[in-house]
């Protein structure tokens, strides 16, 4: 199995039970080994008291992209630590894009950076996630010698 097919099958398996991302209207725009791009439209229900995207929804989009990137090897991985810096507001009706990219993967630990951008390309937030692999796989895979 190619690494790309493994990433696609891992994403499909995760997506099938990821009701949180689905309920928020997220979509997977791109998946590759160690990488994932997700997007989401900021709805009226996602606005805070300032009339801009609530930071929790921006964080959730970034966290979901991170999850799909670190789980792209058919090895279960969970978040160990996350941090985010908000740089610009997300606007009502705007589609936000989260691009997660692997920076390091050694042993059971991984480091992933996620950039959240607005439709015009401006940077909304920078997120860093640390992952840890755990026992289990997303799907059964025959290993060839």
Language-model features: locations:
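Terminal targeting signals and extreme-terminal segments of soluble enzymes
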Residues: 1-145
């Amino acid at each position: 199995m190619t690494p790309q097919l493994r990433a696609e099958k891992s994403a499909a398996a995760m997506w099938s039970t990821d009701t949180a991302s689905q309920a928020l209207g997220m979509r997977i725009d791109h998946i590759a080994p160690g990488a994932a791009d997700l997007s989401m439209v900021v709805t009226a229900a996602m606005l805070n008291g300032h009339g801009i995207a609530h930071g929790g929804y921006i964080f959730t989009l970034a966290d979901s992209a991170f999850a799909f990137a670190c789980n792209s090897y058919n090895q279960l991985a969970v978040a160990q630590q996350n941090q985010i810096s908000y740089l610009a507001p997300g606007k009502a009706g705007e589609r936000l894009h989260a691009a997660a990219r692997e920076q390091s993967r050694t042993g059971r630990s991984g480091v992933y950076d996620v950039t959240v951008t607005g439709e015009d390309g401006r940077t909304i937030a920078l997120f860093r996630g640390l992952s840890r692999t755990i026992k289990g796989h997303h799907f059964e895979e025959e290993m060839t010698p």
